[in-house]
Amino acid sequence: MERLLLTKKKTIRVNEDTWIVLFEERIDFSPGQFVMLETPKLVRKPFVLGYWEDHTAISVQVKGKGTKWIVEEAEKIKGHGPLGNGFEKPGKGLLIISPTCLTMAEAFRKKMNVDVLVGSRTPFQIPLDHETAVGDEEFLSKLSSTGEYDWYLVSGSRGMEKVCWEHLKGKEVYFSLEEYMGCGIGACKSCAVFTKEGVKHVCTDGPIFRGDELCWS
């Protein structure tokens, strides 16, 4: 982990509320790792690392003042990272993600043999070379018709996680969890999750967990 000062290169709108933010600087990270970025007068926020147009990039869903500042106003952004356990796996995998994880998919494609399914509630405003599904009905249809893979990795909303777990139970499924966190180093304990081995923390034990490790009830 190191202190970061990132220079925003440009932003690209993905859909109604999600943007890709590209940076000038290169960061050495493993697929699935994340950074904590600082916003004015607000707590740090976690963003999974990835690539877009061969630049280090993050996907940002605008939910409030902090994420709006990153997309619209920021020129330089302080932070620290990379953080988390990352992920590398042999064989052929399927990433099932929301638009907030688009840049992560590019990091996986650089290191592993993967296909990608992107599920969104609203239409995309940029062309994608992934399989896409807009709306719950289309997403469920495409999820049910996916072929067989050696492993699966899901990153999206809690609802997406639960749907994928029900459809893929019995297979080798991993989840990159998105939980609130204030520090990224295990100090604030805000990102606790229940596992079959007890309480773990997304920032230090994850963010990637096997599906059969987690307590789903």
From Swiss-Prot:
InterPro entries: Cyt_c3_hydrogenase_gsu, Dihydroorotate_DH_ele_sf, Dihydroorotate_DH_Fe-S-bd, FNR_nucleotide-bd, PyrK_electron_transfer, Riboflavin_synthase-like_b-brl. GO terms for molecular function: 2 iron, 2 sulfur cluster binding; flavin adenine dinucleotide binding; metal ion binding. Binds 1 [2Fe-2S] cluster per subunit. Binds 1 FAD per subunit. It comes from the Bacteria. One of its GO terms (biological process) is 'de novo' UMP biosynthetic process. The keyword Iron-sulfur applies. Pathway: Pyrimidine metabolism; UMP biosynthesis via de novo pathway; orotate from (S)-dihydroorotate (NAD(+) route): step 1/1. CDD domains: DHOD_e_trans_like (cd06192). [2Fe-2S] cluster binds at residues 183, 188, 191, 203. Keywords: 2Fe-2S, Electron transport, FAD, Flavoprotein, Iron, Iron-sulfur, Metal-binding, Pyrimidine biosynthesis, Transport. FAD binds at residues 66-67. Its cofactor is [2Fe-2S] cluster; FAD. Belongs to the PyrK family. Heterotetramer of 2 PyrK and 2 PyrD type B subunits. Responsible for channeling the electrons from the oxidation of dihydroorotate from the FMN redox center in the PyrD type B subunit to the ultimate electron acceptor NAD(+). PANTHER family: DIHYDROOROTATE DEHYDROGENASE B (NAD(+)), ELECTRON TRANSFER SUBUNIT, DIHYDROOROTATE DEHYDROGENASE B (NAD(+)), ELECTRON TRANSFER SUBUNIT-RELATED. This is Putative dihydroorotate dehydrogenase B (NAD(+)), electron transfer subunit. The gene is pyrK.
